[in-house]
Amino acid sequence: VVRVSKRTVTFFPPAQARALIGDFTDWERNPIPLQGPVTLEFPEGAYVEYAFLDERGRPFPDPENPERADNPWWTYPRAVRLPGHRFEAPPQPREEPKVERHRLGERRFYVAEAGTSPKATLVAQDGVAFYRTAGLHRVAQALVEAGEIPPVRLVFVEPMDRNQEYRFSEAYEEEFHRVLGEVERSKGPLGEILLVGASLGGLFSLWQALRHPNRFPKVLALSPALKAHPGGTDAYRDREWLLERCAEAQVLPRIYLEVGLLEWLLAPARRFAALLADRKVPHAYRERASGHNWVTWKQALAPGLRYLLGEA
């Protein structure tokens, strides 16, 4: 059971609950021990995902809250919306683009086209999630139909081990470029390429734009996992190596950057946005009153595509 006020939520734990977890605790990383109800303060209008832990540390849903979070990873999160919450619903197309499945060796990827004779190519890491959960192809099609962006091709690349591949892996980088080459061979010129990624996928996309600025001039980065350095494995303690490289780079991409107020990557994203501002790099930056999840990221797709592909 939860009681919601203007800026606070009181969680009333069921009998078997020993801890509270959610976006605000980085889930199991910093659980809040429970001995009774607990009240937490959040930004006005926040969207909050949460769950409980039992005595064995296993997560389970709030049995009194029927609102399941739109979370592709786990079934136990439940959602709370504070007063004033407004979900910026992505636009929906009149006609949904057809998505084709492909494989290059063991690598799965998907290709779709929004409009005819695409002028640019959107390439998303965590391809299945951006296709099935976020509906990036539908958002792009709706914007094309509305005349807000030119026709685009979409490539959804699926990782096999995202934690390893997206952390500055040159082996995956080589395979990723082979996938783009295969798309170009089978579908035609890619045109301008816009990289899209969330969390570790956002980190990889920014890294690729830094390494190949002429090929990848634009990035849509959602809560990028900037706490990372080559050889590191700790998404909380690694140093922000990519920011160091961006501070030194002669050329930086045009970037649309979003992050949630309820996630541990907020401070790194703010530092990155400040660096872009200091260097006068064309960029847009936005914070939302939610966490490290697809509800946050889905809302960023349309404004991000408008900023990166629409007319100025």
Model-derived features with residue positions:
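Primarily recognizes the serine-hydrolase "nucleophile elbow" in alpha/beta-hydrolase
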Residues: 135, 190-242, 247-250
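Alpha/beta-hydrolase active-site loop
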Residues: 167-187
